[in-house]
Amino acid sequence: FKFMDEFQEYISELKEDFPNLIICGDYNICHETIDIHDPIRNKKVSGFLPQERQWIERFLNSGFTDSFRHLNSEPNQYSWWSYRANARNNNKGWRIDYALVSEPLKNNIKRSYILQEAKHSDHCPVGVELIF
C-alpha cells in the first residue's frame, strides 16, 4: 500500500493549494458491497480486500466524495467486467473507476455516470458534470 499512501499524501498536499479537485481514474478497488456483483465470493480477491476498501474509505474521509454514489444508490452499476465467462453480457462486474470530487465541489455535482455502452476495453468511461 506504499503507492496508495504516497498518492494520498500527494493529493492532500495538492489540495492545500488547489482545494477544488476531481481525481478520476481506475482505482482497482470496489468501495462497498453494492459496487461488486458477488461480494461474498470476492471477499478475498484483490480489489475487494478489507485493507483496500479501508484505504479508499480513508481517502474519501480526507475530504472527497464519490460523485457517482453521491447521486446514485442503484445496484448493478459497474465500470469493469472480466473478459471471462461472458461477465459483461451477464453484468457480473465491478465498479472500480471513480470520479472523486473534493469537498468544496460536492454541492456542485449535477450528474455522475458510467458509459456502460462503451466497449473499447474491459472498462467503461466514467464522467461527472458540475454546475457553478
Question: Can you annotate each of these PLM segments?
Answer:
Residues L105-N108:
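Short helix-loop capping/hinge motifs at secondary-structure junctions, enriched
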Residues D35, K110, D122:
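Short acidic, gly/pro-rich beta-turn/loop elements at beta-sheet edges
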Residues R69, R111-I114:
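Hydrophobic/anchoring residues in structured secondary elements
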Residues Y113-F132:
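Surface polyanion/phosphate-binding segment centered on an Asp-His-Pro turn
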Residues L100:
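Hydrophobic alpha-helical positions that pack around
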Residues F3-K92, I96:
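Metal-dependent phosphoesterases centered on the DNase I-like endonuclease/exonuclease/phosphatase
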